[in-house]
């Protein structure tokens, strides 16, 4: 069984080589519809490869040090722990940015904060989903700030930003749900011609995020 796992992993890696995902390097992952079919497929393949490696008890550690910064402007359980687990799997330590305990409360700008937290950061995950027109725009502001810091030599590397839910997309949730469905039906080809029903539950005691 272990040998079969290794064979399957190698096949997935070979499949990954056939996809064009060059634009994803040194780039952010904000909205699902901004990515090409190849980039979405490559993301699914990498997820499956990592899953296979973990099931085969093969280390996925890519980093000896570094930070994964999380900023949650709304409550989270599944996404918070998923992000922390992913960072840990790859060898990054997670540091949660509490804006109330930072210099942001004293007037520090987004540009200043973004660069300050990015000195040893490889990835920044942000959830900002409460207000229409705000969340995704804020993520782009942070992205532009770290890009400027990297360009000007303030940062030796540019951290990648990941949308952990904004006002218009819940990227990581959509991707995880889609991959689960693909695996459940036995492959993406099996989805052709299928109908998927989506239900919406509303409770006055729970504020549903906009996206």
Region spans (language model):
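Positively charged, low-complexity intrinsically disordered leader regions
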Residues: 2-81, 85
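Glycine-rich phosphate/diphosphate-binding loop of Rossmann-like nucleotide-binding domains
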Residues: 73-88, 178, 182-211
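Hydrophobic beta-strand scaffold residues
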Residues: 94-96, 124, 161
